[in-house]
Amino acid sequence: MALCYPKMESGIMEKIDPVLTELRAELSAGKYGDDAHFPSEYELAERFGVNKKTANKAVSLLVAEGWLYRGRRGQGTLVAPQKPFPRGQLCCLYVLKNQYQANFLQGAQAGALEHEYLLNYCSPPPEELPDFLKRLENSPVRGILTGAYGELNTRLPVIYIDRIPKTPPDDAFYSVTCNNYQGGFEMMKQVLDRGHRNIVIFFRRELMPERLTGFRDAMLEAGISDWEKRTFFWLEDSRYEAQKHLRQALKKYPGFSAVACGSDPQMFLTADALDRQGIDWRNRIALTGFGNLLGMDPVLPVASVDQHPYNLGYTAAENLIALIEGRGGDIPRQSMVDVELVNTGNIPFVPQS
């Protein structure tokens, strides 16, 4: 059964927030005994320097969250005899498109539950985001995880997924990301170590740029200086873009033996485009991606980078809870999760001439 929370205006919430933070901390620490009488709204108003209406709304929220309960007539408000569940609520603003996002969400949920928090998943249309954020601020949600909406204009604490901080970094900017540079560099090294030099790159500007930087540095290290000319930027993940850029790559670099893609969706579309061109690429052309959407036993002879999205989600939830509970100094501003190359045995060696 869904809980009903009192509706709050943003101005009232700004006054209530510090009151709630202190009272939650006291209740969590066991300052009040089980079933003990909780201070009256009048006492709270006097203590925190707010009016009685604000104090009453704070108590109503604590009741809705399970910290307190209303006694029988004349008993007043009493302290719940055990720690409430949930201790708080988080919101994940994300777009579920594939297994990567699903695994991330599972990890975030596990991280939240480990600390007695509940995770809500929401995917509002971008044009509705400003109003949605205001509604979240006036709800029991105490923090946000996001990876699809850019930087948010909200007073709630936020953990950003797969985003790098601004320069200079914002004091309020915290992120969790995988080591995209490591993945790009190590995957390109695997391609190069098998003798490939006629290499093309398919990428999108919306992807993490560190992946491309990793590709670049490995190619430069191998003496391939025209890496930028060999990079083809797609406008979107579509069959049309794949076929268009494959034709361009074949024209500029005929006989290329490897395609390094910035994501697994690009890799899948490239495989389809190669098939449609009638090119016998399997075990001849190296094809790599990023995301490991096929798992350890792929149906295509391709290699990819496992970003460990479950671990990312779990870490993001733990870091967000640390921010909510005033422990921001205990976590890094940018948490980095190592990646893992998978199915590199599918990268063919260049035949010796």
Q: What role is predicted for each listed range?
A:
Residues 6-7, 19-25, 33, 43, ...:
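Alpha-helical recognition/docking segments in bacterial nutrient-uptake
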Residues 247-353:
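Flexible loop/turn connectors
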Residues 19, 165, 171-201, 211, ...:
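Hydrophobic alpha-helical segments within soluble ligand-binding/sensing domains
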